[in-house]
Design a protein with these regions (language model features):
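A structural signal for long, well-ordered, hydrophobic/aromatic- and basic-residue-enriched core segments
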Residues: 75-93, 128
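Short acidic, hydrophobic short linear motifs in intrinsically disordered regions
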Residues: 86-90, 96-111
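Short amphipathic alpha-helical interaction segments
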Residues: 112-128
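Minor-groove-contacting beta-hairpin "wing" of winged helix-turn-helix DNA-binding domains
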Residues: 138-145
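Short, amphipathic alpha-helical interaction segments positioned at domain boundaries
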Residues: 146-166
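Long, low-complexity, charged/polar intrinsically disordered regions in eukaryotic proteins
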Residues: 5-82
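A short, conserved structural fragment
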Residues: 127-138
Length: 166
C-alpha cells in the first residue's frame, strides 16, 4: 500500500547559515525525492543457514516519475547500501540474463556503493518480488522466473496506477 514518508524523515528546509543587513545566506539541504512509497516488503536472505530477511521499499521519484527500490534494513546484521536504485536498471540487467543461471554479482553494476552484501541482498529482494528464482544448480545461483516478463511489467506499472490515483 502506498504511503507518504513520516514527518521524522528529511524535510527540504533551507538552513540559515549567516545573515547581514542586506542578504541572508542559505545552505541547500539535500532533497528527498522519494516521499511516495508504493510498496514495502521483505525477502528471505539467500543463505540456507539463516531465516533472516532483507526489507525493501519501492518509491516513485517525484520529479522523474520513475520507480526506484532500496534495501531499507535487514535482520541479523550485514552492512548494505540504502541508496535508491532505478528499477529499470535492475530489470535491464535481468532482461539480458536469458535462460542461463547467473550469480548475484550481476547486480553490482547498479550500485554506486560498494558494500559486499549489496548484490546478494538485492538478489534476495528480486526473489521476494518473484522476478527470479533459485537455480536447480545452487542456492546462490538464480534464473529468471517462468513468469518474469509478466511480473516485471506488473511491477513497472505501479508508477502508472499510482500517478493516475492521485
Amino acid at each position: 500500500m502506498a504511503r507518504k514518508t513520516s514527518n521524522q524523515e528529511e524535510l527540504n528546509q533551507p538552513e540559515i547559515v549567516g545573515e547581514n543587513e542586506q542578504v541572508a545566506v542559505t545552505e541547500e539541504l539535500p532533497v528527498n525525492h522519494f516521499t511516495y512509497i508504493v510498496r514495502e516488503g521483505k525477502a528471505k536472505k539467500l543463505s540456507p543457514k539463516t531465516e533472516n530477511h532483507v526489507f525493501y521499499e519501492i518509491a516513485i521519484h517525484d520529479e522523474e516519475n520513475e520507480l526506484y527500490i532500496r534495501m531499507s534494513s535487514n535482520e541479523g546484521g550485514g552492512l548494505h547500501s540504502k541508496e535508491w536504485i532505478p528499477l529499470k536498471d535492475i530489470t535491464a540487467v535481468l532482461d539480458v540474463q536469458g535462460d542461463k543461471p547467473f550469480k548475484s554479482s550481476v547486480m553490482k553494476c547498479v550500485f554506486s556503493g560498494q558494500s559486499a552484501n549489496n548484490a546478494g541482498f538485492l538478489a534476495a529482494c528480486c526473489r521476494g518480488l518473484g522476478l527470479i528464482i533459485q537455480s536447480e544448480k545452487s542456492v546462490f545461483l538464480h534464473v529468471l522466473a517462468p513468469d518474469y516478463e509478466q511480473r516485471r511489467d506488473e511491477l513497472l506499472s505501479l508508477v502508472d496506477s499510482e500517478t493516475k490515483a492521485e
